[in-house]
Structures are given as C-alpha cells and as structure tokens.
Amino acid sequence: MKSEKLKRGLLVALVWLLILGLWEGAYRIFEWRCYVFPAPSHVFDSLVNLIGFKTWFGDPVWAVDAAGHSVAFQMNPNWPLHGQPLQLTGSLWNSQLPAAVGTSILRLLLGFSISVVLGLFIGLAMFRFKFIDALLGPVFLGLQTLPSVCWVPLAVLALGINETGILFVTVMGSFFSIAITLRDGLRVTPTIYRSAGLVFGAHGIKFYTQVMLPAGLPALASSLRSGFSFAWRSLMGGELIFVLKQEGVGHLLAVGREFGDVGQVVGVMFIMVLIGMAADRFIFAPLEKKVQSRFGLGG
C-alpha cells in the first residue's frame, strides 16, 4: 500500500515537473512578453525576492549579441545571480512572504474560530427548531452563494479599514457554510441514536451534548472542511482590498498588481493555493476520514 502511494506521488511529481519544463522551454524558445504571462523562472525569482534573496533565473541563459539575438552555447555570465553571491538581505522571518503568511494565518485562526462557534450554534438551532430553519435556512443558502468580497464595502462603511473589518469579511464569508452543512448532516443522523438517547434519559441540553453532538461529528467534520475553504477565500479577498499596517498574503497580491509584477502575482496565487491544499491535506481530510471511519462511514 505504501509503495503504491509512493509510486503515485512520484508519478504526480514527474508529470508536474514535465509541465513546468515544457512551460519554461516554450518561453525560452518563443520568448513571449514575460510581463504578460511569466515563465516558472520569473515566478521563482519573485518568490525568492519575497523571502529576502535575489536571483535572476528568468534572464536569458545564453549570451546576447549587440543586435539582441541569443548566442547559442555561450552562457550569459550574469545568469542567474548577476555575478553576486546568493545572500539573505535582512532577516528571513521578517522578510515579506514569511511575515505575510504568519499574519494571514493568525487572522484565519481567529476568524475561523468565530465562524465555527456561530455555525455550530445556529446549525444546531436550525436542526432543532423548524421555525428557525424556515426563517434562516433559505437566507443562509442565499448568503452562502454571495461572493465574500461583496462584504468588503459593508465592512469598510460600518467598521472602517482595520483588522475588525477583515475579521468581519472572513466570518461572514464562512459561517453560513458551516451552519448549513452541519444542519444537513444532522438531518441524516440515524434516528436510532436519538431514540436510544431518549430511552436512556438524555433530555434537554444533555440530549444535544451527549447524543446529537457526538452523533453529528461526521457532519461537523465535513462542515469544518468546507468552512475552512470559505474562510480562507474570504480572508484573501479582504486582504486584497484592505490596506493595513500588518500586511497579509492577499496584500502581496495587490502589491504585485499595482507594480505590474506578474511574476509576484502568479507566485502569491501559488502560495495561496499551497496553504489551502496543505491545510486540507494534513488537517481536515484526515480528521474527516478518521471520524467517518469511527462511525463506519468510510469507503
């Protein structure tokens, strides 16, 4: 089993390396305008610059004559470091990218925690009380489809351009999904759990804390997984527009846009995707799988 997973992982890595190699090779052959669509080397240079180093892998590999044509098999003496040693300018952890990632993760943890608490209580309420479900269910479904950046103007006008505004956008963009997913998951909870709980005297608060909440763990795990993705997208949308003292990953994307650095734009987008994939792969997917396996729901 482990060998199969290793082979699959190596195959995936090989395919991606092939794609990147073809992409870089096409740029070197056709030499399109890199400020319109960057090659992987330009993206690499931009990301390295954001962590305090300086490289020029995107420069021509071959020397260039007076007419601007490449001289085959004659290396460019300035590639890839312009004759300078590779050295860190400043502190690694205080450089732009690590500092921005740390800021965004702290904001995400706070906003996502609030979303989980709100989604948990409102999701349980919609499951328990038909009136609340009829009142809030359709509205929450509609608000769940609303792009998170639509909350930004309201946040700016009501709360100002500050950390509270970004927190508001993050929470409003994610907790509807958590509440709806939890409610729908609780609805398909086997009725035998409820009946057994009532038979053994679980009433009132105990019914929810000792019966429904444990029985609803598969639904809760699924709601956390979907809610995280909504929270991360909402936070990135808010940081893209809000300009604060503490710069997040979304702000680096906005800076790349303002300065026309398409390499930085693509590189920061890659970091956004990488963080989301890592959180899902190493936290939420294993959590959901473990809970489903515990309740005999795993495939």
Predicted regions and their residues:
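Periplasmic/extracellular loop-to-transmembrane helix junction in inner-membrane transport proteins
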Residues: 29-113
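Loop-to-helix entry region at the N-terminal start of transmembrane alpha-helices
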Residues: 99-108, 157-178, 264-271
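Transmembrane-helix boundary motif in ABC transporter permease subunits
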Residues: 110-140
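Generic hydrophobic transmembrane alpha-helix motif, especially the helices
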Residues: 137-177, 184-185
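Transmembrane alpha-helices
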Residues: 168, 172, 204-238, 267, ...
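Short cytoplasmic-facing helical segments at TM-TM junctions of multi-pass membrane proteins
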Residues: 178-223, 249
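Hydrophobic alpha-helical transmembrane segments of polytopic membrane proteins
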Residues: 248-287
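Short cytosolic juxtamembrane segments of multi-pass membrane proteins
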Residues: 285-299
